[in-house]
UniProtKB/Swiss-Prot annotation:
Catalytic activity annotation: a ubiquinone + NADH + 5 H(+)(in) = a ubiquinol + NAD(+) + 4 H(+)(out)
Alphabetical list of Pfam families matching this protein: Oxidored_q2
Subunit structure: Core subunit of respiratory chain NADH dehydrogenase (Complex I) which is composed of 45 different subunits.
Protein name from the UniProt record: NADH-ubiquinone oxidoreductase chain 4L
Protein species of origin: Chalinolobus tuberculatus (New Zealand long-tailed bat)
Amino acid sequence: MSLTYLNIMLAFSTSLLGLLMYRSHLMSSLLCLEGLVLSLFVLTTLMVLTINLTLTNLLPIILLVFAACEAALGLSLLVVVSNTYGVDYVQNLNLLKC
């Protein structure tokens, strides 16, 4: 395993550990999720470049589309929670249920 793959795996595990540890604020959870998606994007891009298979060329682009949708939904949820309650605690998400 090369040093590049090891660094990407370290970034993924650090983001996952941050997501598990800092669950109180929604903004920190969203930042950790973005770190996870960014490391997955770099890993899939490197894998596609090494495999050279034509069927997998669109995989990083599809992952970026899902990451953009995830970021947009997360930011809109952050705006709704902060406008409604004034804080961005994750425990306030239970209060948004109908």
